[in-house]
C-alpha cells in the first residue's frame, strides 16, 4: 500500500475528489495519509480533518531560502514515510531535493491541455483568462509527472472540455474542475500507486 501525501494551497476541491475516490475504493494500492498546506487556515486542512487525515503546514514564507523550504518539506514527507506526492493546487515550486527524492512519484494537475497555457505564470484563473483571450474552443486538464521543468514532466492523462459562449474565467475554471480535474486526478493517482 503506497502512502500518499497531497500538497495544497487553497480550498482543496481536488483533495476532496481524491478523498472521495479513495473512500469509494478506486485506489486499492494507495492511501492518503498526509495533507500538507502551504499556508495555515486554508479550507483544505478542514477537508483533511473531516476524513481523519493528518495534516501539516509548510509555508515558504517561514524559510530564509528555497533550499531551506525544500529541506523542510522533504523532512515532513520523509517523516511520514510518503511514497507518492500529489500537487493539488499547490502554489509553491518544488525544489530539486524533493523532486529527486520522489522521481516519477510526484503528480500535478494543471488546468489546461499541456502544452497550451502552461509554465511559469500560468496557474489558477490566469490559465482560463489566457484561454478565453486566445479564443480557444477546447481547453481541459492535464495530469503529469513532475520534473524540474515547470509543467514539463511526462503527461499521464488529459481530458478536453469545451469552451461555451459567454464563459467567464470563473465559469470555465469550475467546468474544467468538475468535468476534467476531478475525474483525471484520482485515476492518475491510482495509476502511479499501481506502478503503471
Name every feature range the model reports, one short phrase each.
Residues 1-43:
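N-terminal Rossmann-like dinucleotide-binding module
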